[in-house]
Amino acid sequence: MRWSQCYIPTLKEAPGDAELLSHKLLIRAGMIRKLTSGIYTWLPLGLKTLNKAISIIRSEMNRIGAEEILMPMVQPADLWKESGRWDQYGKELLRIKDRHDREYCLGPTHEEVVTHLLRGEVRSYRQLPINVYQIQTKFRDEIRPRFGLMRAREFLMKDAYSFDQDNEGADISYHTMFDAYKAIFTCMALDFRAVEADSGSIGGNFSHEFMVIADSGEDTIAFCRKCDWAANIEHAATLPPQTKALTLEKSMEEVVTPGQHTIKAVSTFLTIPEQQIIKTILYTIDNKPVAVLVRGDREVNEVKVKNMLDATVITMATPEQVHQWTGAPVGFAGPVGFTAGPIIADHELMVYNDWVVGANKPDKHILHVDLARDVQNITFADIRLITDADGCPSCGREIALTKGIEVGHVFKLGTKYSKSMNAFFLDENGEEQLMVMGCYGIGVSRVIAACIEQNNDKYGIIFPPPLAPFEIMLINLDPRDESVVMKASEIYQFFLSEGIEVFLDDREERPGIKFNDADLLGFPIQVIIGAKSLANGIIEVKNRKTGEKSSFSLERFFTDFYSWRDTVYVTWGLS
């Protein structure tokens, strides 16, 4: 491919509404253009990159025996009402009506459609297992679509669905897909981690996320420095207490704390550490009041609370609700005498018995509180966010936190959808059984953005070879010099004959512009030829990832290039 024959509208500056680095670089590199909020057009170079990701994914799906299908993007409301998600999914589900006033939605996912498909086709256990996948456009009506492809409303996704006779078979399907995802992201040369995760709106009882490590990631990942344990911070378990506190001999004491409505203020006012204070946070959970307790220096993990109660909606109480339930303003709520609803305390609070809590009265706290002695209707559970001061829940060793971008998610759904949608088969005894399902997604367009978030520098994108639009940028510095044009054409034809994807910059532009664009586009290898180097009998090459340059003699270029190219692949962990 020659630049003079291509449409690549590069920009010196990104638009003002582009926030995330990948968004800025994709626009500057002429790979995407915004149509409207959260919806983008893929331009030729960007589409070539997207197709690279699709090819890797499709190859691995086919290798494990998954069969490709294509389901409709427009889905009838009846299926979503049957599964119960029509009302649960919320405003992210874009609902439409046809001319006959029938309700539909634009599919954000396809569990209902694929379950409906196979419940009408599968009759016998002999037809199972089945594993199908598609690569198709999805739509989620995000309230504030931001960050370009990272949180778009319309996006490309690979979603796969497995159907098995029993849990044992479902486990095999799950782990087969789990290993396939590891192979996919390894093939893409991405630095990633597979982490334990919450199943969210998809449902199910077991899931893993695949996270690309990047400082700009929205998700926080906890991982062990010694063993293989890793989890999304929302799902990361904390170690249970090894001991429990003895009953406190001191009696409770109410004290005046005027205007001290934060943990820090109470700590300073009473000259006690924040770790001795209990933070009481009130929630409305499925329209019922619940008090949640954590240590003063800790944070509540709302996902854990929601899962513990098997709840659908969790929201923090308003100041008016806090006053209604406790008789006190925000900052003075506490568990002693709280009767508006159940109390859930983090299990860490069992190891100590001399707490300071809000008194449920304005400007007052209570000292010397023993939760086991002084609080009724209390349940202890793991409900806090893990920190890097905690031990690994698997081996007890040191953990660390890092940021990541979710690019894939695998779920063991069980019978959530097959039960609600009556997806039965006849077992070997002729009895009806529910199909056991799994679902597995990769955000294909998101992979490209995540790749760029992980691989960039101040000059532009640094594509790993498997995802680069072209492997080689061949730069002709003197397109008006016939000898340079001929040598560049010779090298260009050589790469094409070897099956190497090469892009020839044959524009009549200044060398500085060509170098800047080459770095912006981020192809892994740059091959540079100009009148000066040609006169000296050399050709220059550059590893875009490391910035290292080398020179080869004209006579030995075609033989020496391959060994040098191997070193470029090694820098990406590829062979």
Swiss-Prot record:
Subunit organization = Homodimer.
Give the source species. Answer: Lawsonia intracellularis (strain PHE/MN1-00)
This chain belongs to which protein, by name? Proline--tRNA ligase
Reaction it catalyzes: tRNA(Pro) + L-proline + ATP = L-prolyl-tRNA(Pro) + AMP + diphosphate
- Where are the coiled-coil regions? none
Q: Write out the domain note.
A: Consists of three domains: the N-terminal catalytic domain, the editing domain and the C-terminal anticodon-binding domain.
Q: What is any Pfam family matched here? A: tRNA_edit
UniProt GO MF annotations: aminoacyl-tRNA deacylase activity; ATP binding; proline-tRNA ligase activity
Keyword ATP-binding recorded? yes
